[in-house]
Amino acid sequence: MSNLIKFYLSSTLWVVVNTFTAGAVLQTFLMENGFSEELTNIICSSGQVISIIAMLLFSPVADKIKEVIPVTARTYLLYFPLVILLLIVCLLGNFGWVLTVLLFLTIGLYSVAGGLQSSLTYKLPYMILDMRHYGRTTAICGILTGVMGLLISLVLTWLQNAWGYANAMTALFLLCLPLLFATYILIRTMRPIASAPAPAKKDAVKINYFRFKPFCQLIAANFLRGFGTGILNVVVTVGYYCKVLDADSAAIVVVISNFTTFMGSSLYSVITGRIPEKWILLITCIGMCVSTPIMLIGNSTLLFLIGYGLATTFWTVVNYSIPVATTQIADYTVMGQYSSGRLLLHTSGSGLAGFLCIRLIDLIGGLPTMILTGVCFLVCGISYFVYMKKNNLR
């Protein structure tokens, strides 16, 4: 089996696990099991803070790792404890104080894994894929994961209606265990391609972030994109808090999220290589700015879902375009460090947004909060466009 097939398969299996153990599904699960909206926000934001710490600690050695493939594969093993804990909660019927403590610990491990992967995610493709077609490859991968995500979200809705919420989640968490193991095996058995960069040296180039122009000139862009992403990451909590979502409509959010991932990936697969990345980023970030406020106009569930669908379609394109732009901005020899620094800014903004989201809504209202979210993405798009145009990047 080729690396490309393994890449597609592992990504598709991982989206199943990630859908059921993070984001909207995890937020709904916690709130359905007695956690308040604010505590749910704190738990999710704490995970982001842990990811930041993991990236901060791992960043100095990211470009010195010789065995990128096996190290990346092992990070997936850190996801098992959270899946097992969520399954136990389903079987017992409640958290209790012991399981609540364990929840924080397992989310911590989950977040450490995410932080480590963030440092390696832009080095792995160089080892296993033909980077000349990286944009198209990731877009096709996004289409596959989007289709899978849409299917499993429909299955989630059907199971909840047929079996009840608790039984449905028990079955799905149980399914996550073999899928997670298969993901690990697929990545672990990948082999470096002939054109893969040579193994890193112990004296690999070390960058000074505050003298490295790509990092410095895009600080605001990456931080504000993270802040906007942080609001969207807790969108179910926002919907619950603003009284426009319940468990049933939250399940629809998951369906929309996966459908728009498919739509955004399909759109990106068509335009990548034909339209310069700087223009893709600018146009889609303008789309984000326009669509995010729609979610909380009039406190309507229908408008919330329409706005969310539009926003996440543009968001998907942005999330695929920035990694491709990053391959133009930074050289492979410093890719791990630059990516760690960039994602550190992004995750810092995301974590801060998670902590402040409910407070912002209380302070300025739901609609102004979503307008602010859109403006964050607009600044990101303009900043990347100006930087890439100035440096003659495509």
Where are these regions (language model features)?
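Helix-to-loop junctions at the C-terminal end of transmembrane segments
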Residues: A54-E67, Q160, G264-E277, I361-D362
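Juxtamembrane intracellular "pre-TM" segments in multi-pass secondary transporters
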Residues: M1, I193-A220
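C-terminal transmembrane helical hairpin of 12-TM major facilitator-type secondary transporters
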Residues: W279-N319
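A membrane-interface helix-boundary motif in multi-pass transporters
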Residues: V68, W158-L177, R359-F377
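Intracellular juxtamembrane helix-capping segments at the cytosolic ends
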Residues: G114-L129, V317-A330
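Structural signature of the two symmetry-related core transmembrane helices
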Residues: P70-L86, W279-I294, G374
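Loop-to-transmembrane helix entry/capping segments in MFS-fold secondary transporters
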Residues: E37-E38, L129-C141, A247, A330-R342
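Helix-loop boundary and gating motifs at the non-cytosolic
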Residues: M1-I53, K213-V255
